[in-house]
Amino acid sequence: MFPILETERLILREVVPQDAQNIYSYFSNDLVTKHYGMDTMTQLADAESLIQAFATNFSQQRAIRWAIERKDELGLIGTIGFNLWSKIHKRAEIGYELHPDFWRAGYTSEALNIVTEYGFNELGFTRIGAVVYPENTASNQLLLKNGFEKEGVLRNYMYQNEQAHDVNMFSKVKR
């Protein structure tokens, strides 16, 4: 069963096929994908495939991805979750994205806190990592503000649009 999480303003729930249009609306926007590590979507089928990948990865316990939805208005505004989930090593990487209309309103921070807490307390993680492009100032600051520590730079770690990119490596460990 997929866990539903709630904060003061948000419901985090399973991403479902009906979310495809909303996901496509922001992943087809270069402002979102330029810091995300994936090419910009060009058709709705790309979003449908991504949703299927989320479901497959969850069923195989390799990843979990929540839809971020505001309590005061239905409709996905972004997603957040864990990738590279290792039960043996009790760790995962967290990733997130939000539609630009909802940037700088504290939603990502709110979701990040409850998902991190869930990872430590319910999934048994002792380490949660995050990789962020150095030029993505907002995301770098978000992680630092929420208790993640910068560990260093991974050179040529990600490829996007056929170009290598360095990333900042962050982590938060269970104390």
Regions inferred by a protein language model and the residue ranges of each:
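Conserved GNAT-fold acetyl-CoA-binding loop/helix
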Residues: 33-53, 64
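A generic membrane alpha-helix/interface feature
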Residues: 46-49, 55, 99, 165
